[in-house]
Amino acid sequence: MAHLLVRLHGSLWELSCWQGCGASAWRDERVPLDPLPPRCPACGDLARPGVVWFGEALPQAEVEKAVEACACDLFLSVGTSSLVYPAAGLVREAQFHGAYTVEINPEATPATAAVDIALAAPADVVLPLIDSRLG
């Protein structure tokens, strides 16, 4: 069984250079206390979380991975407002490919009525339960 997790908005555990010196993103699962704030190992400038902030474009490679992942058996939409495209269109794309769709979100979204199952709860509650049943 293949699993694919696409982080359209990045990851807090990945850092990148604030100035974009060309250093590739690096992963750091610990909070570096020295120096604080963390620095780019290539140029010494400030590092920033490897996430997409408001007004920034989603990484095209991740968008392409997400669209390709819609050709699946099970599609989980977790913690999204389903308001902003291209992410808002992924549930419909997965359904087009015949996927069973599940939304996990405390609040109803525009996708709620379209998914096969809507679980109205926080991801940090639902995902461990799903994991324990699959594990």
Name each model-derived stretch.
Residues 1-135:
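Conserved catalytic alpha/beta core of Sir2/sirtuin-type deacylases, generalized to analogous enzyme cores
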